[in-house]
Design a protein with these regions (language model features):
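Topology signature of small-to-medium multi-pass alpha-helical membrane proteins
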Residues: 2-151
Length: 151
């Protein structure tokens, strides 16, 4: 089957689980959304860590202490999102399931909304959100059609 042709769901084996369905070679291009969403999420986490590092360096150069920095709620929240972004990115790359993609999309949406309200940068989080959501929605649409056909 050519890569650019639509998948004829009626030719697929009956009784597949959602994980087996998602893992079919026919959906390799859609699963690529999950891989890229995971990579972008990991990069997003690294950028957050980098920005906290730059902020810490600035504070230390100006004679401040890091105790005050890490007591700030925004810094703690950014550290939490950094860890969550990296962990979810790794899990999405490894598992490539729609559930993981939706979880990552929700987390990134929350992060984007928090960044907007605090005047931060939303570019990378928004990209990860969109990649996760697009991949998960495309697989779920095909999964629902497959379930209707295989009944």
């Amino acid at each position: 089957m050519a890569e650019n042709q639509k998948v004829d769901l009626s030719t697929l084996p009956k009784g597949l689980t959602k994980e087996e369905f998602t893992a079919l070679p026919n959906f390799k291009k859609i699963r690529a959304f999950f891989t890229w969403a995971g990579v972008v999420s990991i990069v997003s986490g690294i950028f957050v860590l980098s920005s906290i590092g730059h902020l810490s360096q600035s504070i230390l150069q100006n004679g401040g202490s890091l105790d005050g920095l890490f007591q700030m709620g925004a810094v703690k929240l950014n550290l939490l999102f950094m860890v969550v972004s990296i962990v979810l990115g790794i899990l999405l790359i490894k598992k490539k399931t729609t559930t993981m993609a939706y979880i990552l999309a929700i987390i990134e949406l929350i992060y984007v909304l928090l960044a907007i309200t605090s005047g931060g940068s939303v570019g990378i989080g928004a990209i990860s959100f969109l990649l996760s959501l697009v991949g998960a929605i495309r697989i779920d649409k095909k999964w629902k059609l497959y379930q209707e056909i295989s009944v």
